[in-house]
UniProtKB/Swiss-Prot annotation:
The keyword Coiled coil does not apply. This is Small ribosomal subunit protein uS19. GO terms for biological process: ribosomal small subunit assembly; translation. Keywords: Ribonucleoprotein, Ribosomal protein, RNA-binding, rRNA-binding. It comes from Oceanobacillus iheyensis (strain DSM 14371 / CIP 107618 / JCM 11309 / KCTC 3954 / HTE831). The gene is rpsS.
Length: 92
């Protein structure tokens, strides 16, 4: 289930403050964050946010289509290496 509409969207305060400072100064810097739970607001559009995936920070460029989604959706935490291939030698 999603978040209740009466509660509204959530974003960490420290992330919002960093975005506001960059918007007032018209700067474009990469913002490192561990907050995968934060919702993307329209003020985030045009910025690059480096979201932590458990090993490293993955740079995510925010576009208008991403508004309303969570930051963690764009930084996958698991790497899929594929299923084991057929071993042709053991079939003989």
């Amino acid at each position: 289930m999603g978040r209740s509409l009466k509660k509204g969207p959530f974003a960490d305060d420290h992330l919002m403050k960093k975005i506001e400072v960059l918007n007032t100064d018209d700067k474009k810097q990469v913002i490192k964050t561990w907050s995968r739970r934060s919702t993307i607001f329209p003020t985030f559009v045009g910025h690059t946010v480096a979201v932590y995936d458990g090993r490293k920070h993955v740079p995510v460029y925010i576009t208008e289509d991403m508004v309303g989604h969570k930051l963690g959706e764009f930084a996958p935490t698991r790497t899929y290496r594929g299923h084991a291939g057929d071993d042709k030698k053991t079939k003989r």
